[in-house]
Amino acid sequence: MNSTSLYAAIDLGSNSFHMLVVREAAESIQTLTRIKRKVRLAAGLNNDNHLSAEAMERGWQCLRLFAERLQDIPQPQIRVVATATLRLAVNAGEFIAKAQTILGCPVQVISGEEEARLIYQGVAHTTGGADQRLVVDIGGASTELVTGTGAQTTSLFSLSMGCVTWLERYFSDRNLAQENFDDAEKAARDVLRPVADELRFHGWKVCVGASGTVQALQEIMMAQGMDERITLAKLQQLKQRAIQCGRLEELEIEGLTLERALVFPSGLAILIAIFTELNIQSMTLAGGALREGLVYGMLHLAVDQDIRSRTLRNIQRRFIVDTDQANRVAKLADNFLKQVENAWHIEPISRELLLSACQLHEIGLSVDFKQAPYHAAYLVRHLDLPGYTPAQKKLLATLLLNQTNPVDLSSLHQQNAVPPRVAEQLCRLLRLAILFAGRRRDDLVPEITLRALNENLTLTLPGDWLAHHPLGKELIDQESQWQSYVHWPLDVR
């Protein structure tokens, strides 16, 4: 592989050190290596902001691992940044001098505002959804809050609170008592209050989280079969569960890994304070953050207006998808959706996911015609899809699995991006669109009227269409039968 196409970003965080190595490909990035080590640098800061020798040694030890991988990458294509703990440490110079010797490249201590800007860029390049967003990143010793529209930030704040420093300050006795949480939340709200008005003034349509705490919450919710949206009610529920556990070493929540457990209560307290103070309705996990911001900054790639569209284009190119057919199916599915929207009330994000499934429905053919829906589902489940959340990927894979043949109803109920009933409705529309676009010509798609009454679908075709299309009639009869097996009434006239 040509080393000039390789880029590396290293983030010396207060809780963990991370390294990301990527290859530039098709105006996007392909991840080659991700290494993360819990160094807990912030835990080595004393009251005078002096970093202990033990904490520094943990950091250097980690960098020796990273250094081996960096040898293959040209130095101008490497960026190493240090964040909150090394901004605070009075003896940061000693740590950085040795770090630069180990890595063989410069280490830059970035300001809180620059960190916030880079986090926002990482989110803007990798996360789909509405343009106007609030980004929250809870680090080990600082928390970044950024509002912006598209690629432009409108306000940037880096606050002196993090999951490691709050752990040392409010959970140092390792007790998970109501008082510990109350103190941690109150302190976090006090830190937030001076910046809350400006953040609210700029406003947001979506809120995304880009930190280990949010990642941990996502893993917990997926493991427990909840939908992926983080809400204050879910956070309070998890807090009560933590309080029931009593002590940090006894913290057990389904889906919470041992690695994340130590700083989870402190991160949770900060997040509850953010939700409460800013009146956040819901939050989802960002597709990328600081490291992705560093990489995209080196590549000078413009932020795509629609990240999901770029992702779909790249995948269609890679798997030689017939885009005319994909568009034909999408147009038909959209037409069907408009006809039933008064009865089914399908939300815009669900519509977008249906159209994404239409664009990708034939990728399985690049493996083999036989079992193409299984291949399509497998590919979507395992491909990197910038702009789509893990739950959305799972829904897409499930729709593609059920695009034809008998329906696996349980798989539609196991995804958690949309309610099961909505997943069933999207699946029905996708199947009908694929069926009626089957001859791959616009002029051969009949005029179809679709009506919905609760879960009953009535499909009306031109008067003599069925008589003149015996194969089409056979396929429609088969589809009616398959839908009836899962109690989806389909009446064809």
From Swiss-Prot:
Reactions that this protein is recorded to catalyse: guanosine 3'-diphosphate 5'-triphosphate + H2O = guanosine 3',5'-bis(diphosphate) + phosphate + H(+)
Gene3D superfamilies: 3.30.420.40, Exopolyphosphatase. Domain 2, Hypothetical protein af1432
GO biological process: guanosine pentaphosphate catabolic process; guanosine tetraphosphate biosynthetic process; nucleobase-containing small molecule interconversion
Origin: domain of life: Bacteria
Keyword Transit peptide found: no
A GO MF label: guanosine-5'-triphosphate,3'-diphosphate diphosphatase activity
Entry-linked Pfam families: Ppx-GppA, Ppx-GppA_III
Keywords in alphabetical order: Hydrolase
EC number: 3.6.1.40
InterPro entries attached to this UniProt entry: ATPase_NBD, GppA/Ppx_hydrolase, Guo-5TP_3DP_PyrP, Ppx_GppA_C, Ppx_GppA_N, PyroPPase_GppA_Ppx
Biological or metabolic pathway of the protein: Purine metabolism; ppGpp biosynthesis; ppGpp from GTP: step 2/2
Function field: Catalyzes the conversion of pppGpp to ppGpp. Guanosine pentaphosphate (pppGpp) is a cytoplasmic signaling molecule which together with ppGpp controls the 'stringent response', an adaptive process that allows bacteria to respond to amino acid starvation, resulting in the coordinated regulation of numerous cellular activities.
Family in the record: Belongs to the GppA/Ppx family. GppA subfamily.
Protein name (database record): Guanosine-5'-triphosphate,3'-diphosphate pyrophosphatase
Gene that this sequence comes from: gppA
